[in-house]
From Swiss-Prot:
Keywords: Ribonucleoprotein, Ribosomal protein. HAMAP family: Ribosomal_bL12 (MF_00368). One of its GO terms (cellular component) is cytosolic large ribosomal subunit. GO terms for molecular function: mRNA binding; structural constituent of ribosome. It comes from the Bacteria. This is Large ribosomal subunit protein bL12.
């Protein structure tokens, strides 16, 4: 039987308390920490997940308020969406409503600028 197998057999017979003492003794003897590699390995993975969540490729433009210049906002909404007068008026009257969904950031910012210029309030999500 090899030395490695002998150590494994001894470890199998130890209690949890004895194993804990063994780990502490090994850490002191060799100047290492059993917890360090796990923490170091987990940190970059968590950071990568957070970065992936933060990146967004599709945006929704939500009209939150028509402001005082409702007619101008209706005109801009019609231009952007291609809706008829009645549908655009309903969309503007019943805020908050999505004007356009699943669009690029650039397009969302252009639409936001147009609606705000007309007097409305917009939120990009």
């Amino acid at each position: 039987m090899s030395k490695v197998q002998e150590v494994i057999d001894i470890v199998k017979q130890m209690t949890v308390l004895e194993l804990s003492e063994l780990v502490k003794a090994l850490e002191e003897e060799f100047g290492v920490s059993a917890a360090a590699p796990v923490a170091v390995a987990a940190a970059p993975a968590a950071g990568a997940v957070a970065e992936a969540v933060e990146e967004q490729y599709e945006f929704d433009v939500i009209l939150t308020s028509s402001g005082e210049k409702k007619i101008n906002v209706i005109k801009v909404v019609r231009e952007i969406t291609g809706l008829g007068l009645k549908e655009a008026k309903t969309l503007v009257d019943e805020c908050p409503n999505p004007v356009k969904e699943k669009i690029t950031k650039e397009e969302a910012n252009e639409i936001k600028a147009k609606i705000e210029e007309a007097g409305g309030s917009v939120e990009v999500k």
